[in-house]
Amino acid sequence: MAQKLKLEMVTPAAQVLSEEVDEIAAPGSLGQFGVLPGHTPLLTTLQVGEFSYRKGSDVYYLAVNWGYVEVAEDRVLVLVETAETQDHIDLARAKAALGRAEARLRELTPADKEYHNMQAALQRAMVRIQVAGRGGRG
């Protein structure tokens, strides 16, 4: 059994990560889950949320937006729509997006076509703010 996981994260635009890590924690569609070396093979979906990985005593965080995770042979492949590291999140922009989504949701009802899109925008903004607020490595 390997002592590390090979973590690869890819978006449609680019490869975001290719790292040897000790563990990961991901926002699964059915709840948060973790993966350590030797984990049982797994294929699952991700929801919008905070993704983290640990290298030694350092923990790194990313905001991810919907995707898939495959765990096999001490390798974790993450395919997501978007992924932003702490350093690449513009906190002011994320807060502005949160404000816009909150304001728009106050004007809508669940019957409106735009309602669910605004809920998703609100969730993405909240996760981006949470990840940006981590203030560096955990």
Swiss-Prot record:
Keywords annotated in UniProt: ATP synthesis, Cell inner membrane, Cell membrane, CF(1), Hydrogen ion transport, Ion transport, Membrane, Transport
Membrane topology label: Peripheral membrane protein
Keyword set includes Kinase: no
This protein's record includes keyword rRNA processing: no
Compartment(s) of residence: Cell inner membrane
Main subcellular localisation: membrane
GO cellular component: plasma membrane; proton-transporting ATP synthase complex
Segment forming the signal sequence: none
Gene Ontology molecular function: ATP binding; proton-transporting ATP synthase activity, rotational mechanism
InterPro entries attached to this UniProt entry: ATP_synth_F1_dsu/esu (IPR001469), ATP_synth_F1_dsu/esu_N (IPR020546), ATP_synth_F1_esu_C (IPR020547), ATPsynth_dsu/esu_N (IPR036771)
Family assignment from sequence similarity: Belongs to the ATPase epsilon chain family.
Subunit structure: F-type ATPases have 2 components, CF(1) - the catalytic core - and CF(0) - the membrane proton channel. CF(1) has five subunits: alpha(3), beta(3), gamma(1), delta(1), epsilon(1). CF(0) has three main subunits: a, b and c.
Functional summary from the UniProt entry: Produces ATP from ADP in the presence of a proton gradient across the membrane.
Protein name per its UniProtKB record: ATP synthase epsilon chain 2
